[in-house]
Amino acid sequence: MIKEIKDINTYLEICDKLEYTDCKLSKKALYGFMVAGKNVHVYTTIEEEMKGCAVISVNNDISGDLTLSVVFLWMNPHYRKLWKNYMKFIELKAIEFHCKKISFTTSRSEKSIERQMGKYGYKKVYSIIEKELI
């Protein structure tokens, strides 16, 4: 069962999941985002251990549309079917929050993401060009 959490210890456990992903967020940044509150929602599936988690945010995107942004999503690889449950859950949350779109940012290969997320109706809309300043 996917449920909303506001427990600081669970936030820390979610931060530990970063080491199992290629996510570029730091633990400090993810934790800060989760405790920020207002437009951020954190959901988990925990039975004996954490099987999955989602950190989402509701804001206006660059075109002004209310958008549910997936900040961080993790599934235990032993529970692959949970992925489909979280995709449906995120869509229901977007409807609940009256969002017009769902978006996420990733640094993974565009082709692999399009293949995986295309099954759920997602498509590439923007490209991000950046220059790192030291």
Task: Label every PLM stretch briefly.
Residues 38-40, 118-123:
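Short glycine-aromatic motifs
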Residues 105, 123-134:
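Conserved catalytic-core motifs of GNAT/GCN5-like acyltransferases
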Residues 1-27:
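Short amphipathic alpha-helix that is part of the acyltransferase structural core
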Residues 24-29, 84-88:
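Well-ordered, non-membrane alpha-helical segments in soluble/globular domains
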Residues 3-4, 121-125:
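Short secondary-structure junctions
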